[in-house]
């Protein structure tokens, strides 16, 4: 086949999903459909890169235009995601060769990998081995992570909606606690995601507008946890405000690097498995002060809450999907679309790009000047950064009082290769 003929594209979702990753999928698919001179069919990996390895591919052309359009307002990963990190090329060349074999069998010339830090690394490695094996493949990393820790982009699609959920939940829960504090609950602890970066925890700070407003304490991974200082601040808050609302990142740790809630296990990417910092902190307070408490873990709720998604986040998620295809057909390879902030007030942004070599495996943490001097709150500079990202509402359609989310048919592509044994 002539290499000037249109080739197929493969889209895959990776890692933890978000409220808007499907909007990115819609951006990729709808834009690819408009570039018939370059792209023939769009395929998707069922459960991400695992589907690609197992030649378990979905024919997206079998989905209706209404379903693809409906992805814009549907949370989670419509095509299935996976926590599966490819090892280095030298460590497990067979996996990379298998992917190229699958690409060759299905004439896949474009690969769009929608994920976070590790996914950008995988896309970069694939672009390299494609060259080594003499198979031309355009690899574009498409940004997605609620943790907001990818470098070279002002923000990451998925973060704005989580930030909005956490800010709203913090404000609403604080009103509840304030109502009950006289005779009942004095402390409320909300545990949010964020293994090493405190962006999501910082978003809780948007719930308050003036001094004394909740949350009264935010615990960031970037600030070493000091038990005595923390307990003193809790007591001060209860004595002056009548109650205390705390937002704690799952990655909060002591000065020696020990996580407050280290479960002693790792996930498929090799990251420490965390969970349970909320009750750890709450019990610490009860033992020290005897206050009645409630704690909650936002967990999957924070990243699945499409009903309260940020309009800006939805728009940016679609935009990076669209830009990924436009970069690919323009001849770019091993790059990632980025969000570029032009101004904060009024908020203006555009789409740029960065090379995967720059982005891969780099983690962006919350800057120190975004955290107050005492380490328990956010600064005005942080607020200026965060506020535009949660702006606007993009409600899904409702039927019978519930969001009308779509589900794909997921028609599989006929396999051409023998099974792959991992």
Region spans (language model):
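N-terminal phosphate-binding or glycine-rich loops at protein starts, especially the Walker A/P-loop
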Residues: 2-56
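Glycine-rich oxoanion-binding loops at beta->alpha junctions
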Residues: 1-2, 55-109, 118-119, 171
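Accessory alpha-helical/coil subdomains and C-terminal extensions
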Residues: 102, 113-115, 121-136, 140, ...
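C-terminal non-catalytic interaction/assembly regions of soluble proteins
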Residues: 259-422
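Short glycine/serine/threonine-rich phosphate/pyrophosphate-binding segments
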Residues: 18-28, 52-53, 94-97, 117-125, ...
């Amino acid at each position: 086949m002539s290499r000037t003929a249109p080739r197929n594209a493969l889209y895959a979702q990776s890692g933890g999903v978000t409220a808007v990753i499907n909007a990115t999928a819609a951006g990729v698919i709808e834009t690819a459909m408009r570039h018939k001179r370059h792209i023939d069919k769009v395929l998707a990996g069922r459960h991400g890169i695992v589907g690609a390895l197992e030649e378990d591919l979905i024919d997206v052309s079998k989905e209706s235009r209404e379903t693809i359009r409906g992805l814009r307002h549907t949370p989670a990963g419509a095509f299935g995601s996976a926590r599966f990190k490819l090892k280095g090329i030298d460590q497990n060349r067979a996996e990379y060769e298998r992917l190229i074999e699958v690409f060759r069998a299905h004439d896949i010339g474009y690969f769009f990998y929608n994920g976070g830090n590790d996914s950008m690394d995988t896309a970069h490695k694939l672009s390299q081995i494609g060259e080594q094996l003499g198979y031309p493949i355009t690899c574009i990393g498409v940004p997605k992570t609620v943790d907001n820790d990818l470098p070279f982009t002002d923000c990451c699609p998925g973060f704005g909606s989580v930030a909005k959920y956490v800010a709203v939940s913090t404000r609403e829960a604080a009103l509840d606690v304030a109502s009950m504090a006289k005779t009942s609950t004095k402390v409320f602890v909300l545990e949010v995601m964020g293994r090493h970066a405190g962006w999501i925890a910082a978003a809780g700070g948007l719930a308050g507008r003036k001094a004394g407003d909740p949350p009264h304490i935010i615990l960031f991974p970037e600030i070493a946890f000091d038990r005595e200082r923390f307990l003193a601040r809790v007591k001060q808050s209860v004595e002056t405000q009548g109650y205390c609302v705390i937002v704690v990142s799952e990655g909060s740790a002591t000065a020696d690097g020990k996580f407050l809630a280290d479960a002693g296990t790792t996930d498929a990417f090799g990251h420490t498995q965390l969970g349970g910092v909320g009750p750890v902190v709450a019990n610490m307070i009860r033992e020290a002060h005897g206050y009645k408490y409630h704690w909650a873990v936002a967990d999957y709720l924070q990243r699945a809450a499409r009903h309260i998604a940020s309009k800006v986040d939805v728009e940016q998620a679609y935009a990076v999907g669209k830009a990924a295809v436009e970069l690919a057909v323009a001849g770019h390879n091993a790059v990632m679309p980025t969000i570029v902030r032009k101004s904060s007030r009024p908020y203006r942004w555009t789409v740029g790009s960065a090379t995967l070599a720059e982005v891969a495996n780099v983690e962006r943490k919350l800057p120190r000047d975004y955290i107050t001097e005492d380490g328990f709150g956010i600064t005005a500079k942080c607020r200026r950064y965060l506020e535009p990202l949660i702006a606007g509402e993009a409600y899904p359609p409702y039927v019978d009082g519930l969001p009308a989310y779509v589900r794909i048919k997921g028609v599989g592509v006929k396999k051409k290769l023998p099974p792959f044994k991992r």
